[in-house]
UniProtKB/Swiss-Prot annotation:
Zinc fingers, C3H1-type class: 94-121, 165-202
Example GO BP: cytoplasmic translation
SUPFAM superfamilies for the chain: CCCH zinc finger
PANTHER family linked: ZINC FINGER CCCH DOMAIN-CONTAINING PROTEIN 15, ZINC FINGER-CONTAINING PROTEIN P48ZNF
Region (Disordered): 1-71, 352-380
Organism: Drosophila melanogaster
Low complexity: bias regions: 38-50, 352-361, 369-380
List of residues that carry Phosphothreonine: T218
Official protein name in the record: Zinc finger CCCH domain-containing protein 15 homolog
Keywords on record: Coiled coil, Metal-binding, Phosphoprotein, Repeat, Zinc, Zinc-finger
Coiled coil: 246-270
Length: 404
């Protein structure tokens, strides 16, 4: 018998109507609300109902899980086909100077937390050759000898070849190379590989270039320098005062003017002789004003004239040029009289106050008790002076009305 057909499910229109009914029930009375919160709630309900109650972020989570699954598979394949042995570093070696083996194959998952270096150029960086170790001092045990080396040693001993003596003296070529920073893995001694002198510095040896750095010049402060120069002048010197300074300033200004005048005369004489080196264009026109007239006008030339503009606003303000030399010559010493307090000012004030008090006491003793008693010649006080003042004022008003 053929299998039973599955019962027909609800149509899409029916499902859509159900969803619209659910949305209408949940948002009843909120469609006409214009508040931001109400509108967001309506949109959220519509999205939930349309998506069938599933959270929209589930698709993103699925994609993330699939991506992680693929990465895990790639790691497993890399471990299968590209096995890497665990790196071991000798004691005292910086791990950052060793390139990570997993990083070379692109399988390192530690990133910046990896203790090994992820810089591929680190392999090209070789440790500098030590200047305190002679590479020829390394022991060469017999276990590392080959047949050729063994034969060479036997022949040397049988022939009785004399070995060149060795010494603790440092090779001068080695010292020169170290001082000039030329010593390295590619440096070779001019004496060859059989040089009897040492190619290493003893412990505690200081190079000349390092000595120069250590010998810093003694620094002296500005105050100490001024005091030193003043002491070197000697005791018999002219003291600088305002008058001597102004005289010196005046003499310097005169010397400067004389020097400028002599220089101008020299340039003028050179210009008259045809020498124009070191002469500016302004000086040329000042020495020979005829140079302004450059000949008759030609076709295409523009005519112009120079004149001074007269403006009331410009003439209303008068400007004066300040001459520092004239101001310095007109300077005078400050008169400190009346502005500087004396050292005995407090004692003087106390003495003056004591004198004033003594004078007042003496005057009081001379006057006697009559000075404190009231004077008998004083006019008597009339207590009823203003008693009838109100009546008098009323009489005055009546008189004024009668007059009117």
């Amino acid at each position: 018998m053929p299998p039973k057909k599955a019962p027909p499910g609800p149509s899409k229109k029916t499902e859509q109507k159900k969803k619209e009914k659910v949305i209408e029930d949940k948002t009843f009375g909120l469609k006409n609300k214009k508040g931001n919160k109400q509108q967001k709630f309506i949109q959220q309900v519509q999205k939930q109902v349309q998506s069938g109650g599933q959270h929209p972020r589930q698709d993103g989570d699925k994609r993330k899980e699939e991506k992680e699954k693929k990465l895990a598979e790639q790691r497993e394949m890399a471990l299968i086909f590209k096995p890497v042995q665990t790196q071991k570093v000798e004691k005292g070696t910086d791990p950052k100077s060793v390139v990570c083996a997993f990083f070379k194959q692109g399988t390192c998952t530690k990133g910046d937390k990896c203790k090994f270096s992820h810089d591929l150029s680190q392999e090209n960086k070789v440790e500098k050759r030590s200047i305190y170790v002679d590479m020829r001092d390394e022991d060469d045990p017999m276990t590392n000898w080959d047949d050729a080396k063994l034969k060479e040693v036997v022949e040397k001993k049988s022939s009785g070849e004399k070995q060149r003596p060795t010494t603790d003296i440092i090779c001068k070529f080695f010292l020169e190379a170290v001082e000039k920073s030329k010593y390295g893995w590619f440096w070779e001694c001019p004496n060859g590989g059989k040089c009897i002198y040492r190619h290493a510095l003893p412990a505690g040896y200081v190079l000349k270039r390092d000595k120069k750095k250590e010998e810093k010049p003694t620094e002296i402060s500005l105050v100490d320098l001024i005091e030193k120069e003043r002491a070197a002048l000697g005791p018999n010197q002219t003291r600088v005062t305002l008058e001597s300074f102004l005289a010196w300033k005046k003499r310097k200004i005169a010397e400067k003017k004389a020097k400028l005048a002599a220089e101008e005369e020299r340039k003028k004489s050179d210009f008259s002789k045809g020498k124009q080196f070191g002469i500016s264009g302004r000086e040329m026109f000042s020495f020979n004003p005829d140079l302004v007239d450059d000949g008759p006008m030609e076709e295409g030339d523009a005519a112009f004239d120079v004149y001074n503009r007269e403006d009331d606003d410009d003439n209303a303000v008068e400007f004066k040029e300040l001459d520092l030399a004239a101001l310095s010559l007109a300077a005078k010493e400050v008169d400190g009289s009346g502005t500087i307090a004396s050292t005995n000012r407090l004692l003087d004030q106390a003495t003056e106050a004591a004198k004033t008090a003594a004078a007042e006491d003496a005057a009081a003793d001379e006057d006697g008790p009559s000075s404190s008693a009231p004077a008998n010649d004083a006019a008597p006080i009339n207590k009823d002076l203003f008693v009838d003042l109100a009546g008098e004022l009323d009489d005055l008003d009546l008189d004024d009305e009668d007059d009117d």
